[in-house]
UniProtKB/Swiss-Prot annotation:
Protein name: Mediator of RNA polymerase II transcription subunit 1
Pfam families: Med1
Lineage, uppermost ranks: Eukaryota, Fungi, Dikarya, Ascomycota, Saccharomycotina
Keyword Transcription regulation: yes
Role description: Component of the Mediator complex, a coactivator involved in the regulated transcription of nearly all RNA polymerase II-dependent genes. Mediator functions as a bridge to convey information from gene-specific regulatory proteins to the basal RNA polymerase II transcription machinery. The Mediator complex, having a compact conformation in its free form, is recruited to promoters by direct interactions with regulatory proteins and serves for the assembly of a functional preinitiation complex with RNA polymerase II and the general transcription factors.
Residues modified as Phosphoserine: S155, S423
Location in the cell: Nucleus
Summary of subunit composition and partner proteins: Component of the Mediator complex, which is composed of at least 21 subunits that form three structurally distinct submodules. The Mediator head module contains MED6, MED8, MED11, SRB4/MED17, SRB5/MED18, ROX3/MED19, SRB2/MED20 and SRB6/MED22, the middle module contains MED1, MED4, NUT1/MED5, MED7, CSE2/MED9, NUT2/MED10, SRB7/MED21 and SOH1/MED31, and the tail module contains MED2, PGD1/MED3, RGR1/MED14, GAL11/MED15 and SIN4/MED16. The head and the middle modules interact directly with RNA polymerase II, whereas the elongated tail module interacts with gene-specific regulatory proteins.
């Protein structure tokens, strides 16, 4: 029995692959055979000398296809539901058209083969097979070759009542109301471009609608007994609720597919999600990397090489791995997460992708000649082996950054609190206190003074005429730090203090700042520090934005950033 089941499953897979590979031309005979492969009952009747009608039916759906023999084309297609609900929307508005049109008819008249009709017919049959209405008295076995659909209807004692045609039609209204109550600027459309589904769209830069995600029902391949409940949006509680525990169906899930991640032609436009932010139970399908695509996010690749705008100094602040996710399971109470997932999709599209495009430069214009990496990053770039490691999207260790970022990190992170993240507020506070460039702790704890004779500086106590404003007593100790790049300037010493270094004269009081780094550097005024993480971006002391800001704040940040780097 097991061998027989395995044979049938393999045969079904081969049939599905063949139908996708060579769907066949649009004829009445081919449509009849296609319906039979799904287990639909079909028969043909002659309405006149010129018109034939193919009627195909299952438990709920009845589809009539009128074929004009004289003109050799499909003339009309109608869908009727054998249930109390007969208001299922099988119309849509095609691009460039103002009126809604019949999806099933378009599938058979506007395409060269049966592929579009086959996909739409499979969706209708899925809703039919997993719907359980009151008129069902026994399990329905229509002889389908899809064994999973038959097995889902095999035990009626473990089934609830749920009309998926009715629920799917009402779901779009619930989602639209949810967005309205939560002030989410998204548009909801039922069916798009002759495909069934609930589409979430947003306004693009050129004013056109851009699809972000598609919501539809799909067979749960991992758990045939998974219970899908009828969750609706309540305007009173402003949340998704299940009013009846008896309204459910087994073996089906509600899926949200990221439309951008369904198109792998432009790899830089994929949406990358933070792994630690998402529960594994939500992930149905990840995007697999093609052989000619990098397996790490483009914005992460910038940290492993120096191919970026010379006016920008990148600092990596990512704390989690970024992964591609194609489909999310939003069944039942997971419907609450739709807004959060879409928020990240918007953040990735508007901010992360645009930052990458603005910072990226051709290799000939990169700053790699001046800023050599201190350490080779442990993941490959697009010109190396794409499949050498599965950890390519791991956040880059801070010690593995290229030279410019490491040097900046030393300057910014030389305080006693080594785990402290660099903050742009520190520079503002020091300006208010009269210290324009350096932190007092950095000046006192990690000086690096180059002596002509090469001898180390001897430890001396320093006397002061009076206490400084911050209440510190200045002292210089013999601390050797070969990695530091900071040397004191004359304006870095507080007024009212005097320091004696060995037998230095008064003329030596003004200590000239020297760059002890072996690497040439550009003036700091012309290089802006850009701190990038999965949920926030800081552009020096000029501007910043984060995931939780309004979309308008993101757009303003990108506009300002574009003006600076262009």
């Amino acid at each position: 029995m097991v061998e027989g089941d395995s044979y049938v499953e393999t045969l079904d897979s081969m049939i599905e692959l063949f139908k996708d590979y060579k769907p066949g031309s649009i004829t009445l005979e081919n449509i009849t055979r296609l319906c039979q492969t799904l287990g639909l009952e079909s028969f043909t009747e002659e309405l006149s000398n010129e018109l034939s009608r193919l009627s195909t039916a299952s438990k709920i759906i009845v589809i009539d296809v009128d074929y004009n023999k004289k003109q050799d084309r499909i003339q009309d297609v109608k869908l009727v539901l054998a249930s109390n609900f007969d208001n299922f929307d099988y119309f849509n508005q095609r691009d460039g058209e103002h009126e809604k049109s019949n999806i099933l008819l378009n599938s058979l008249t506007k395409y060269p083969d049966l592929k579009a009709f086959h996909n739409n017919l499979k969706f209708l049959y899925l809703l039919d097979a997993y719907s359980h209405i009151e008129s069902d008295s026994t399990s329905h076995n229509n002889g389908s070759s899809d064994k999973s659909l038959d097995s889902s209807n095999a035990s009626f004692n473990n089934q609830g009542k749920l009309d998926l045609f009715k629920y799917f039609t009402e779901l779009s209204h619930y989602i639209r109301q949810c967005f309205q109550d939560n002030c989410c600027d998204f548009k909801v459309r039922t069916n798009l471009n002759d495909k069934f589904g609930i589409y979430i769209l947003t306004q693009g830069i050129n004013g056109k609608e851009v699809p972000l995600a598609k919501i539809y029902l799909e067979e749960n391949k991992s758990d045939s007994q998974y219970r899908f409940y009828e969750y609706i949006y309540s305007q009173e509680t402003k949340s998704w609720i299940n009013e009846s525990a008896e309204n459910f169906s087994n073996g089906i899930s509600l899926v949200m597919e990221i439309v951008a991640n369904a198109k792998e032609s432009n790899y830089t436009d994929l949406i990358w999600f933070p792994e630690d932010f998402i529960s594994p139970e939500l992930i149905i399908d990840k995007v697999t990397c093609s052989s000619n695509s990098s397996s790490s996010p483009p914005i992460i690749d910038l940290f492993s090489n120096n191919n970026y705008n010379s006016r920008i100094q990148l600092m990596n602040d990512f704390t989690t791995k970024l992964i591609n996710i194609k489909k999310f399971d939003i069944s039942n109470d997971n419907l609450d997460l739709i807004s959060e997932i879409l928020k990240w999709v918007q953040w990735s599209r508007i901010v992360l992708q645009n930052v990458f495009k603005l910072v990226s430069t051709p290799s000939s214009n990169s700053n790699s000649s001046e800023l050599e990496p201190d350490y080779q990053a442990p993941f490959s770039t697009s010109t190396k082996d794409k499949n050498s490691s599965t950890s390519n999207t791991e956040p880059i260790p801070r010690s593995n950054r290229h030279g410019s970022v490491v040097e900046a990190s030393r300057r910014r992170r030389s305080s006693t609190n080594k785990s402290k993240r660099p903050s742009i507020t520190e520079a503002m506070m020091l300006k208010e206190e009269g210290l324009q460039q350096f932190n007092l702790h950095e000046i006192l704890s990690e000086p690096a003074i180059e002596e002509e004779n090469g001898d180390s500086i001897k430890e001396h106590s320093t006397t002061m005429d009076g206490a400084n404003d911050l209440g510190f007593t200045a002292s210089v100790s013999n601390q050797e730090n070969a990695g530091t790049d900071i040397v004191m300037e004359d304006h870095g010493v507080l007024q009212g203090t005097s320091q004696n270094y060995g037998t230095a004269t008064a003329d030596d009081a003004d200590i000239e700042m020297k760059d002890v780094s072996s690497k040439p550097s550009k003036p700091e005024s012309s290089v802006l520090q850009l701190i990038v993480s999965e949920d926030h971006i800081i552009l020096d002391t000029i501007s910043e934005c984060n995931l939780y800001d309004d979309v308008k704040c993101w757009s303003k940040f990108i506009e300002k950033f574009q003006d600076i780097v262009s």
